[in-house]
Amino acid sequence: MKAKQIPVMVSLSLSLLTLAACKPDAPVAETPAAADASAASDRDAAEPAYPTRAYFGDTHVHTGWSADAGLDGSSLGPEEAFRFARGDEVKSNSGQIAKLKRPLDWMVITDHSDGMGTISEIRAGNPEMIGTDEFLEKMNAALKTSDVKLRNTVMLEAVTRQVNRTLPKAMMDPKWMVSAWKHTVEIADRYNDPGKFSAMIGYEWTVNADDGNNLHRNVVLRDGADKAGQVLPLTTFETEDPEGLWKWMAEYEAKTGGKALAIPHNGNLSNGRMFEETRFDKSPMTREYATARQRWEPLFEVTQMKGQSESHPGLSPKDEFADWDLWDRGNLDAVPKKPGMVRTEYWRESLKSGLRLQGTLGANPFKYGANAGTDTHTGLTAAEENNYWGKLASIEPSPDRMKRPFNKQFASFETAASGYMGVWAKANTREALWDAMQRRETFATTGARMTVRFFGG
């Protein structure tokens, strides 16, 4: 299984050269001495004049505090997620002992903003939830059962309801988010250890336009709880237009003095919408739009557990590895893909489109650097095929996990053990890592800690 992983990682690296650019809080234990020099050698947070090493981490981690993850059976929260990422041994959602072979240098927890804070209330049987809607009662029952199939069925129904905008009104009340977000940012601050392990703050804004076209963005903040805690994450209940997200980010920066960036992901499940050459409302792109998109979205996630969005055999027919981890059957809610859609779904093609649009608009809306994350919904950021803890709690290691379905279109065995991002930062701190992401001094791998660097100008 490991042998097949080498070609795609090389392919991703070569593509970079073309770019030219809520549970009770537990006490924080001391980090054990890490065997891996990648995470342990830098004990000094002082910044050199220029980056001298790549720091590896994950910008896309969901815990049991995300509604879909919790429904599927994930019980691990941000505490366990950060501990696992920095190299600690933790107990998985299925009760097994889990540990990374090599610790990460940094990680961002990106629980969904939609429904944030609701799972604990539904599980507890809060009367403001239970009894107000039949589906909430079904969710409560699923959260209490050990029936994996039932939990997965209810989880998939919740995803479909989010896609179709038919979630119960009680789940859309922002008051549930207040406590969950407060705990999230405080936990990140406690685990943040500059120079050793950077615990970064973020969330996922989960737009599924037109009945399931994946236009999700992960929002990554440069800051700590003192600034992040002054606001609440944006939800798709408020707006589904990316320009609305960019407005939220601008307001966040103006209010707090902090910094924010967004990372789109899974263009492969967008049914042609990720890199379409119009605005969200189908009106023509303008120079102002292209400039704003480049300003707020410096990176694009090219690989993760739901397949790769780097390229496609139909777009790169001479690339024998373009069919690696291919998820091209339809969108997130299994609406089938139509001919021509793949042209505006993949990163490599978008780089060419962006250069062409630069000539007509005077700005490049698709000036994306390379990002990779796992999109794990277990709290366990594992991107190794021989230490793969699954995309969902229901498909953690077990004798029959490969027989289980993932969703309406894919089986669990089709999920990919991927990926991590290397960041050429001046130091292992939130600020230095974020600044490097903004500069696009990054590269994506399917999990290997290879080091790739390109100089141009």
Model region roles, listed by residue range:
Residues 1-10:
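Bacterial N-terminal signal peptides that target proteins for export
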Residues 22, 27-457:
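Extended, charged catalytic domains and RNA/DNA-binding interfaces, predominantly
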Residues 9-18:
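Bacterial N-terminal signal peptides
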